[in-house]
Design a protein with these regions (language model features):
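Internal, well-folded beta-alpha domain core
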Residues: 93-273
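Near-N-terminal "mature-domain entry" segment
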Residues: 1-127, 131, 142, 212
């Protein structure tokens, strides 16, 4: 099984490290598109324009500055650069997920690089999927034209735990894979509602719990067995101090896709303890 993640908006600036080497990144067939996007980012030098295009605030000044010279920036592993809710939860659940065998089964999608492995060395940057660059147009559309064919080489017919957000799903619909899209709901007073922000934390915890098991999960039955074992152990504490756990899991029937793959929805039904 593979695990697909979105990037995080929050990032840790790399300290001292090597500069960006596109030829060293995973999925080398994406190199030309990466170069085009990096060049397009470098052309946006007006500060006000950059804040508008990259949907940035003052706290993103370092990221916007890095965008103008990405090839010369210091780099660190992608798993260390991204530091949002999902990544923090995954690391807390299973720190070993980012190294060794666990990392081999994780792919991080990116507006700047298309797709990455956790060990790929990348710089500080800011470019979300869905951004419209003046010289290239919508980044999602650009990646959609190349990501599918590039990733099919490695992931055709593979089982994928899909934790991506909508923009990153649109960049690669992957009709050749068997996607399990993760949804999180809250049960309260007998009614269920969709969890939005805290869903990132649940997806991170679930990914961490399964990361080291990926090599042994070959089909839907294997995944259901693994879920039955790991989900009862997951716990999330919110800002109020309330702790939630997974009451039940639901798996929708598989829907066949046009290129031999399928999609399902995996729903974690959570409840406060």
């Amino acid at each position: 099984m593979e695990i697909w993640l979105p990037p995080s908006e929050g990032k840790n600036p790399p300290g001292e490290g090597p500069s960006l080497s596109l030829s060293a990144l995973s999925f080398p067939s994406l190199t030309d598109t990466r170069k085009k996007i990096i060049d397009a980012c470098a052309q946006i030098t007006d500060e006000e324009q950059a804040h508008q295009i990259f949907n940035a605030s003052l706290r993103h000044s370092a990221e916007l500055e890095a965008n103008q010279a990405l090839m010369s920036q210091s780099c660190a592993p992608a798993s260390a650069v991204f530091n949002g809710v999902l990544f923090d939860a995954l690391t807390a659940q299973e720190p070993r997920a980012w190294i060794g065998e666990g990392s081999q089964h994780i792919t991080i999608f990116s507006g700047l690089f298309g797709a990455l492995k956790p060990t790929d060395l990348i710089p500080l940057h800011r470019l979300a999927m869905g951004t419209k660059l003046p010289t290239l147009g919508n980044v999602t559309s650009l990646w959609k034209s190349v990501l599918g064919s590039a990733l099919a080489e490695d992931y055709s017919e593979k089982l994928v735990l899909d934790c991506r957000s909508s923009d990153y799903k649109q960049a690669c619909l992957a009709p050749w894979a068997h996607l399990w899209e993760v949804r999180v709901e809250r049960l309260r007073n007998g009614k269920r509602s969709v969890v939005s922000h805290n869903a990132k934390k649940w997806r991170g915890m679930l990914s961490g719990a399964l990361a080291l098991r990926c090599g042994g999960i070959e089909n839907a039955s294997d995944l259901e067995d693994a879920l039955a074992e790991v989900t009862p152990k997951l716990r999330s504490r919110d800002a109020r101090g309330a702790t939630s756990h997974v009451k039940e899991i639901e798996v929708s029937p598989a829907k066949a896709t046009s290129q031999g793959g399928s999609t399902r929805t995996l729903t974690l039904v959570t409840v406060e303890a």
